[in-house]
């Protein structure tokens, strides 16, 4: 509907028209501030321009049957849609069923390479990883729903100093807990019960002869062994969140192509040597300073691996590349983009979304850290506590680039303070009514909408606003809009439900048809958030 109304107004006015939702529903379904934009051009008051444009629009043949009213108010032009238009879109939505909301397609389908999570396989996934994981998964769902082609990839950092440190940590734990030796740990190492678990499992799984080899050989084998175990656990954790990747890319394999990348960087005059190090001239592309790629000891920096990986990605020629990183990686954006320019790619194709910190509470106190993982809150612990769906909803309920704090006990309440419960409850009420109704679903679907009051029309309009919510959430990377949409629609439904008996009115079938639309919109919205909406709520819920 939004697209239709915008198109008609732009054709009549021959100007770009911004369509908004009025803050006060008494002002109608849509509004436009176009009069303010034209005030300087025509050197008139916005109030006068709004009156003139409202008259022009209302008398134009293309708007006949679209609106019940077009009113100029304080410089805005407010539009109330006709019931005929609402019914036309309602019928189409009910025919589309689970595809309702996907009819807004981008001008052309994009190929999107989406990389997210990519946590080092050196420990279990913690709550900080979950936010980017859930966001990336839902963004992919929405993009595909809108007709885009999406590849979701997890970049596995399976080489380098962190992996060796993992192997060393397991070896020291093996010596302490299996061999019962007195061990002195280094200042930096991986700790937690999971390291001890791996050490004990290695004792059962690996050949005893391994532990008679020299220490470097033992650490190398344990590094690979522990890394593989951690990656399996990470995949299990992601599965528990309902997240599945199309591809897992190995840094170790991709890094074999580093020589070819360095040759191209040298040809592009992107490198120089200073202080026995090899530097990238990233400052030429808005980086704060040049960056080291090869250190004095001839080892490679973390950035080098990122450059080789991005070269592999950009060879595949996607329309857009989206990375979801932790906010602490902000400084890496400019240097990676600089390397892409030197390698001959368009760095504007790369968009990096940053996930801010998460602070978890329970009874207004910091959530208990996991003994198994040391100073972290594990995803699995929180899923066991509140469930996958509640966790996904909360992580998506605020913009990715804002800090998120929430108390998990809120997600256990059975009232309006728990947003996901309140949405489930709305859908449950609808299904209970449909079961009690003397009318078949087919009767309800075939019932024309003729006798709706303003409040009922507004609720119907809200259900039909789902396509715009989906489109906006994708274009602005603002998936919180989907959560807000579902919360608002559920709240409007509860107000409608509590206002009077629905089944005991002469227009019961019309009202049930609105209820079907509420259920459809909530179900489709939740599906894109990776949540299965409930049709029944039991006492334990």
Swiss-Prot record:
<keyword id="KW-0030">Aminoacyl-tRNA synthetase</keyword>
<dbReference type="GO" id="GO:0005524">
    <property type="term" value="F:ATP binding"/>
</dbReference>
<dbReference type="InterPro" id="IPR008909">
    <property type="entry name" value="DALR_anticod-bd"/>
</dbReference>
<dbReference type="InterPro" id="IPR036695">
    <property type="entry name" value="Arg-tRNA-synth_N_sf"/>
</dbReference>
<dbReference type="InterPro" id="IPR001412">
    <property type="entry name" value="aa-tRNA-synth_I_CS"/>
</dbReference>
<dbReference type="InterPro" id="IPR005148">
    <property type="entry name" value="Arg-tRNA-synth_N"/>
</dbReference>
<keyword id="KW-0436">Ligase</keyword>
<dbReference type="InterPro" id="IPR009080">
    <property type="entry name" value="tRNAsynth_Ia_anticodon-bd"/>
</dbReference>
<dbReference type="GO" id="GO:0005737">
    <property type="term" value="C:cytoplasm"/>
</dbReference>
<dbReference type="Pfam" id="PF00750">
    <property type="entry name" value="tRNA-synt_1d"/>
</dbReference>
<dbReference type="GO" id="GO:0004814">
    <property type="term" value="F:arginine-tRNA ligase activity"/>
</dbReference>
<dbReference type="Pfam" id="PF03485">
    <property type="entry name" value="Arg_tRNA_synt_N"/>
</dbReference>
<dbReference type="Pfam" id="PF05746">
    <property type="entry name" value="DALR_1"/>
</dbReference>
<dbReference type="GO" id="GO:0006420">
    <property type="term" value="P:arginyl-tRNA aminoacylation"/>
</dbReference>
<keyword id="KW-0067">ATP-binding</keyword>
<keyword id="KW-0648">Protein biosynthesis</keyword>
<dbReference type="InterPro" id="IPR001278">
    <property type="entry name" value="Arg-tRNA-ligase"/>
</dbReference>
<feature type="short sequence motif" description="'HIGH' region">
    <location>
        <begin position="119"/>
        <end position="129"/>
    </location>
</feature>
<keyword id="KW-0963">Cytoplasm</keyword>
<keyword id="KW-0547">Nucleotide-binding</keyword>
<protein>
    <recommendedName>
        <fullName>Arginine--tRNA ligase</fullName>
        <ecNumber>6.1.1.19</ecNumber>
    </recommendedName>
</protein>
<dbReference type="InterPro" id="IPR014729">
    <property type="entry name" value="Rossmann-like_a/b/a_fold"/>
</dbReference>
<dbReference type="InterPro" id="IPR035684">
    <property type="entry name" value="ArgRS_core"/>
</dbReference>
<comment type="subunit">
    <text>Monomer.</text>
</comment>
<comment type="similarity">
    <text>Belongs to the class-I aminoacyl-tRNA synthetase family.</text>
</comment>
């Amino acid at each position: 509907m939004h697209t239709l109304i915008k198109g008609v107004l732009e054709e009549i006015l021959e100007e770009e028209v911004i369509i908004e939702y009025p803050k006060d529903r008494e002002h109608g379904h849509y509004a436009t501030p176009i009069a303010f934009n034209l005030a300087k051009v025509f050197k008139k008051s916005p109030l006068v321009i709004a009156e003139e444009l409202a008259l022009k629009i209302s008398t134009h043949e293309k708007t006949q049957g679209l609106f019940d009213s077009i009113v100029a108010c304080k410089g805005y032009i407010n539009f109330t849609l006709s019931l005929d238009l609402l019914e036309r879109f309602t019928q189409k939505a009910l025919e589309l069923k689970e595809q309702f909301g996907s009819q807004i397609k981008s001008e052309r389908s994009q190929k999107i390479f989406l990389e997210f999570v990519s946590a080092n396989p050196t420990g279990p996934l913690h709550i900080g990883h979950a936010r980017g994981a859930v966001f990336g998964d839902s963004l992919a769902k929405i993009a595909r729903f809108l007709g885009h082609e999406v590849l979701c990839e997890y970049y596995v950092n399976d080489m380098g100093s962190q992996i060796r440190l993992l192997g060393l940590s397991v070896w020291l734990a093996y010596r302490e807990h299996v061999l019962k030796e007195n061990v002195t740990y280094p200042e930096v190492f991986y700790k937690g019960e999971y390291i001890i678990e791996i050490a004990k499992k290695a004792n059962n799984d690996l050949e005893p002869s391994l532990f008679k080899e020299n220490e470097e050989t033992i650490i190398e084998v344990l590094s690979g062994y522990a890394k593989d175990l951690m990656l399996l656990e990470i995949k299990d954790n992601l599965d528990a969140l309902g997240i599945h990747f199309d591809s897992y890319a190995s840094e170790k394999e991709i890094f074999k192509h580093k020589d070819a990348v360095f040759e191209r960087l040298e040809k592009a005059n992107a490198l120089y040597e200073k202080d026995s190090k090899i530097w990238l001239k990233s400052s030429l592309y808005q980086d704060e300073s040049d960056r080291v790629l090869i250190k004095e000891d001839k080892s490679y920096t973390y950035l080098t691996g990122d450059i080789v990986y991005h070269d592999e990605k950009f060879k595949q020629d996607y329309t857009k590349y989206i990375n979801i990183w932790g906010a602490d990686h902000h400084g890496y954006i400019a240097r990676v983009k600089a390397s892409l320019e030197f390698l001959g790619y368009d760095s504007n194709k790369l968009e990096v979304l940053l996930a801010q910190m998460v602070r978890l509470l329970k009874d207004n106190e910091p959530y208990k850290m996991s003994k198994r993982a040391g100073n972290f809150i594990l995803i699995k612990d929180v899923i066991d506590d509140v469930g996958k769906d509640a966790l996904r909803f909360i992580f998506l309920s605020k913009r990715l680039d804002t800090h998120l704090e929430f108390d998990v006990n809120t997600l256990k309440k059975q009232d309006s303070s728990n947003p996901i419960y309140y949405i489930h409850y709305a859908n449950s009420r609808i299904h209970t009514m449909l079961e009690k109704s003397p009318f078949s679903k087919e009767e309800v679907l075939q019932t024309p909408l003729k006798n709706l009051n303003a409040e009922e029309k507004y609720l119907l309009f809200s259900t039909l606003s789902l396509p715009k919510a989906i489109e906006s959430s994708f274009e602005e990377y603002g998936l919180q809009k989907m959560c807000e949409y579902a919360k608002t629609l559920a709240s409007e439904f509860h107000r409608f439900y509590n206002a009077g008996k629905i089944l005991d009115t002469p227009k019961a079938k019309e009202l049930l048809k609105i209820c079907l639309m509420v259920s459809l919109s909530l179900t489709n919205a939740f599906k894109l958030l990776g949540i299965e909406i409930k049709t029944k709520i039991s006492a334990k819920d």
